[in-house]
Amino acid sequence: MTPWTETCGQIRPLIEESDGAAAEVHHLEITDAKLHYHERTDEIYHIIDGHGRMLLDDEEVDLKPGLVIYVPRGVKHRAWGNLKVLVICIPAGVLKDVHEIGEPPHTA
């Protein structure tokens, strides 16, 4: 499937809701994601390549290859840097559950 740009960056679905799956798996290339949250979806980010930072509510986390981050539903989050990420979304349907809330300030 051809990648496209979403709130988090360039997305390439690997397993989708339309496949009948209970969860979705996406490959993301993130440079500067928009601040957002999900009402019904938990996410697990596995950093494959690159470095950056992630804002989880009011906490900033350094991102590097091999790191796994759990983002529960309801947590405002965004990432920035030069990142290649595998994201597992539970349950499936995350693209219908994205609620953008604007651009926050962040440290470099």
What are these regions (language model features)?
Residues 58-74:
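Short acidic-glycine-tyrosine-enriched beta hairpin
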Residues 95-108:
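Acidic/histidine-enriched, glycine/proline-rich intrinsically disordered or flexible terminal extensions
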